[in-house]
């Protein structure tokens, strides 16, 4: 789970677009960049190198 206020201010580091939270995978999704950023121990990992590519 991610804090709603944090989700409101976080953006994709590549596109600067808002992110969507996927509770099933515990990731922040950037639709435009087609990347999923992991959340580990409650901390969003906003590094492109750590993101999973979406198909």
From Swiss-Prot:
Q: Where are the transmembrane segments?
A: none
**Per the record, what is one GO cellular component?**
cytosol
Note the InterPro entries from the entry.
Answer: Trm112-like
Source superkingdom: Bacteria
Q: Tell me the HAMAP family matching this sequence.
A: UPF0434 (MF_01187)
As for family, the record states: Belongs to the UPF0434 family.
Q: Which protein, by its recorded name, is this? A: UPF0434 protein ERGA_CDS_01260
Organism equals: Ehrlichia ruminantium (strain Gardel)
């Amino acid at each position: 789970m991610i804090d709603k206020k944090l989700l409101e201010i976080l953006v994709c580091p590549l596109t600067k677009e808002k992110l969507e939270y996927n509770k099933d995978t515990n990731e922040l999704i950037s639709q435009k960049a087609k990347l999923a950023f992991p959340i580990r121990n409650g901390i969003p990992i906003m590094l492109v190198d750590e993101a999973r590519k979406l198909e």
